[in-house]
């Protein structure tokens, strides 16, 4: 069951299943299919950014992937330093909207906080690995949303 600890499994499988189970159990299961497009956006962002980063020597996908050989600063990484984690967050917001679920919104909020602290840890490792080039990158590109934070 080690695979259940992997962040993508938790986000893209366990969060929607837990939401469906919870909402069904309390009798409030409701689906707004249009919002599933937000889920699709988040999932595709995660997958495409992971492939882009890996193809450019930026390390393997996921938290347990191979360490980065080089700093990836192009493509979507020129706009946000964490597009894969952002894909997770967008997906979970999509789950909350699709199922009109406060339960899923609470999970999304908790996981967003977890990702934020995970990113801060990742940043310490990337600073140690790449030094000044990474520090310059952090000055140019926001952690989460372009132009905001």
Functional labels for PLM-detected ranges:
Residues 82:
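Extended, alpha-helix-rich binding/interface surfaces that flank or overlap catalytic cores
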Residues 1-77, 86-149:
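Membrane-anchoring alpha-helices and their flanking helix-loop junctions
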């Amino acid at each position: 069951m080690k695979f259940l600890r992997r962040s993508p499994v938790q986000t893209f499988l366990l969060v929607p299943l837990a939401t469906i189970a919870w909402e069904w159990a309390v009798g409030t299961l409701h689906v707004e299919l249009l919002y599933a497009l937000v889920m699709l956006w988040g999932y595709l962002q995660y997958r495409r950014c992971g492939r882009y980063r890996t193809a450019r020597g930026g390390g393997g996908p996921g938290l347990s992937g191979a360490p980065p050989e080089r700093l990836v600063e192009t493509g979507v990484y020129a706009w946000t330093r964490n597009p894969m984690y952002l894909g997770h967050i967008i997906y979970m917001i999509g789950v909350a909207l699709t199922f009109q679920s406060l339960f899923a919104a609470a999970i999304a909020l908790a996981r967003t906080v977890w990702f934020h602290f995970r990113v801060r840890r990742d940043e310490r490792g990337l600073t140690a690995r790449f030094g000044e080039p990474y520090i310059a990158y952090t000055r140019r590109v926001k952690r989460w949303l372009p132009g905001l934070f």
